[in-house]
């Protein structure tokens, strides 16, 4: 028995649009464009037979999963799993790349390389 796994990134979020690093903070949510992206993704994926949908519990991921789920004829219970959380970027969360480069130059260079 083989398993097929599809990974989908969340749609455009408010932090993405503002150029802010998100990490695990849950202050960002989908923009109108992000909802459109999720709907389009669902329309593409709805011809594939899925057994389950898993999502990070973060708003931006959960909103994406819910929008994708609407595209299927079958109703799914979305399984929210903390193991799917974004990498925690601690003090970088909520900052722009430029702010990080300025404030945490050495750490940024290590992370980037």
What feature does the model see in each segment?
Residues 40-109:
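Phosphate-coordination/substrate-recognition cap region in phosphate-metabolizing enzymes
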